[in-house]
Amino acid sequence: MEKAKVYFTDLRTSPTSNLLDKMERLVKKAGIAQLPLKDSFVAIKIHFGEPGNLAYIRPNYAARLANLLRSYGAKPFLTDSNTLYSGRRSNAVDHLESAMENGFNPISAQCQVIIADGLKGTEYREIPIDGQYCKAPKIGAAIADANIVISMTHFKGHEQAGFGGALKNLGMGSAAVPGKLELHASEQPKIETENCI
């Protein structure tokens, strides 16, 4: 297997080159123009963040990517799937309101915002794969139906996986609620009776 190229840029800016410009150059250098973008539905898989925290990519980066994709004739949209846990992202109405609170809306993002697995997390496609642990993951319909999926991901520490990034964004983040249930099914509570009162 050939080693993947990893592109890097620093955070230095100048009056003629800001961070958005640098991101666009990185995306172009990585070969975005070689994708069959014309008339394609392009899902930009992103995490909209929980209201009140800052652990998400800012909407202006998503807007820059959406505009670049549109310049190649694509039909981009931002997407994420509902969460398994109760909270502000467990259904599409609250999820979209949370996204708007963090600045993700069709005006700021320069493209539509679609919750991938629908109103209650039940809109999905089963994708047959030959996986060891999963044979037919349940992927949010908007992601499964897209012609192209681009992961726009921040890197973070994760309590179970050690770290989260593109693989978690696509793997867990693309799963519809029933798919998330299956992914977490191997995690059973363990009771240590000797520690019980």
What are these regions, as identified by a protein language model?
Residues 1-197:
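N-terminal and secondary-structure boundary signal
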